[in-house]
């Protein structure tokens, strides 16, 4: 017999380990989206148009490799499953190339020659990092529909994922703020140390997820006996790191009090301790075990890419999800990439305060994530998206009107923006497993990797063009790039207008598009229940 629609519940430790898998990609992506453009223009000294081109080329290459990795992941056959081997194999180069993004090599004493050398270097590193990012993150995202087919449980699972994602984003900003405070007026060293620490945290969290999770009907990477032996060691190591941080903070080891190193040790200790805790309690759910005579789930179809694209475009619900996701994340990342310029050049605040404003956004998003998750038990996903986006659009209107000196209003608007940002995290990714189910009903095949890859592909192409246009607009508006080692220059009025337009009206335009698409999204709770019932009936008939 197949699992009933109310079954396929996941243990708390499984959800926790799954959530940890998005911690590493989230903290790397968060620092990149908030500070990479600023780093390239104001620390490395690259003109804004070239800096925007670095981001565009990296993202377009990233978009190209998404469907390739998705198809390869779908077709992977191993005793551990289709997704976990990719996560495990890609995490080390992922961390190494991330660290390399924050280095500033010297190519020539001639300023123009050095700028072009840096441009080529950062393009190459961006392409390599984005390939590694896809290798670990895309198979991870495709795990959601494989771990459970329960409508509400998928939303809960994504709540854990985005709790780690938003929580990690918040913690990465705190780490940046502490590093900036500990290393004032040394931006190159700030970003260099930040890159190393973020990389270590990312590898640790990815290991936690890949080694604790088990794919449906497959062997775990760590045997039960090895899990039992490792659990107390990891927990002890985590506690030791936290105690070291506490001792350093209270000057018991000759330290300088609580600083970014203490905070880093605490984060690393929590990851290792959480890893050990989930290994200690790691009983496998019944529906994930390989049982005799159990019906097989849909298998991946070995079709050419163009034919798969044709099938994807024939799935009307999928097109809506792509549009909603693209609009939401263009709004998120356009605002994030320009925020530091807005805070410094328009509001007259320092770079460090851009981190605290971003914290207000993401802290609110983290809290609201659980509020929306609770409401999702009663409301359709598109209703939740509509409510959050309306609040968000109001905040964007306020950002256009806020004036220098109105700092309290700026933080208030950041909090309201966080209410909407949380739905951009939660809702599109909760919709896509339902689309995969609909595709299986129509085709008899499960192609999670392809759908997740193609969804992200379009998002990245759109984002690449958006970020390139931001850089190009800044350059055309007369934006003055900071010379390394010099104070931040005063921008002309034309550049200030371009910064304000990119931080408020432009994201609001994309949010409006997402709202319109959400209204017509066809898969409601009742429709999804009917899809799952038809799939279960088909599986039972095939088994008979």
From Swiss-Prot:
Q: Which UniProt keywords apply?
A: Cell membrane, Membrane, Symport, Transmembrane, Transmembrane helix, Transport
Entry-linked InterPro entries: MFS_2 (IPR039672), MFS_trans_sf (IPR036259), Na/Gal_symport_CS (IPR018043)
Record-level GO cellular component terms: plasma membrane
Give one Pfam family, short name only.
MFS_2
**What's a single GO BP term from this record?**
sodium ion transport
Family the entry assigns: Belongs to the sodium:galactoside symporter (TC 2.A.2) family.
Protein name as annotated = Uncharacterized symporter sll1374
- Please name the source species: Synechocystis sp. (strain ATCC 27184 / PCC 6803 / Kazusa)
């Amino acid at each position: 017999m197949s699992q009933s629609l109310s079954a396929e519940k996941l243990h708390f430790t499984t959800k926790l380990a799954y959530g940890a898998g998005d911690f590493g990609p989230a903290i790397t992506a968060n620092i990149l989206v908030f500070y990479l453009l600023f780093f390239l223009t104001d620390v490395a000294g690259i003109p804004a148009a070239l800096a925007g081109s670095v981001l565009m080329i990296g993202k377009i290459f990233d978009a190209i490799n998404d469907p390739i990795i998705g198809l390869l992941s779908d077709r992977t056959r191993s005793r551990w499953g289709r997704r976990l081997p990719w996560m495990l194999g890609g995490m080390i180069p992922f961390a190494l190339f991330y660290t390399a993004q924050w280095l500033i090599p010297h190519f020539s004493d001639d300023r123009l020659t050095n700028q072009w050398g840096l441009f080529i270097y950062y393009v190459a590193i961006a392409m390599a990092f984005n390939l590694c990012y896809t290798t670990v993150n895309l198979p991870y995202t495709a795990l959601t529909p494989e771990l459970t087919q329960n409508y509400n449980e998928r939303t809960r699972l994504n709540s854990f994922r985005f709790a780690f994602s938003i929580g990690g984003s918040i913690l990465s900003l705190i780490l940046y703020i502490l590093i900036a405070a500990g290393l004032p007026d040394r931006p190159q060293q700030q970003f260099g140390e930040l890159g190393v620490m973020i990389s270590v945290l990312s590898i640790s969290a990815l290991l936690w997820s890949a080694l604790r999770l088990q794919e449906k009907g497959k062997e775990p990477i760590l045997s039960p006996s090895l899990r039992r032996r490792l659990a107390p060691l990891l927990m002890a190591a985590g506690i030791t790191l936290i105690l070291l941080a506490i001792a350093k903070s209270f000057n018991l080891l000759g330290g300088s009090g609580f600083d970014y190193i203490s905070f880093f040790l605490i984060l690393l200790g929590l990851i290792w301790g959480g890893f050990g805790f989930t290994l200690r309690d790691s009983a496998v759910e019944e529906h994930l075990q390989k049982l005799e005579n159990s019906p097989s789930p849909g298998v991946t179809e070995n079709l050419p890419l163009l034919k798969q694209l044709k099938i994807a475009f024939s799935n009307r619900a999928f097109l809506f999800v792509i549009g909603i996701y693209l609009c939401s994340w263009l709004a998120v990342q356009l605002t994030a990439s320009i925020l530091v310029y807005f805070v410094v050049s328009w509001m007259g605040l320092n770079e460090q305060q851009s981190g605290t404003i971003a914290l207000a956004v993401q802290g609110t998003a983290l809290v609201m994530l659980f509020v929306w998750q609770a409401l999702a038990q009663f409301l359709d996903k598109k209703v939740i998206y509509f409510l959050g986006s309306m609040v968000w659009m109001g905040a964007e209107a306020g950002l256009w009107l806020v004036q220098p000196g109105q700092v309290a209003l700026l933080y208030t608007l950041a909090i309201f923006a966080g209410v909407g940002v949380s739905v951009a995290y939660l809702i599109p990714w909760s919709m896509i497993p339902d689309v995969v189910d609909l595709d299986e009903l129509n085709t008899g095949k499960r192609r999670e990797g392809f759908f997740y890859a193609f969804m992200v592909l379009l998002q990245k192409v759109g984002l690449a063009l958006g970020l390139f246009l931001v850089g190009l607009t800044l350059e055309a508006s007369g934006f003055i790039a900071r010379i390394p080692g010099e104070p931040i220059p005063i921008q002309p009025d034309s550049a200030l207008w371009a910064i304000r337009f990119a931080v408020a009206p432009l994201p609001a335009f994309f949010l409006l598009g997402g709202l319109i698409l959400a209204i017509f999204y066809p898969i409601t709770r009742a429709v999804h229940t009917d899809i799952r019932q038809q799939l279960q009936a088909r599986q039972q008939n095939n088994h008979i």
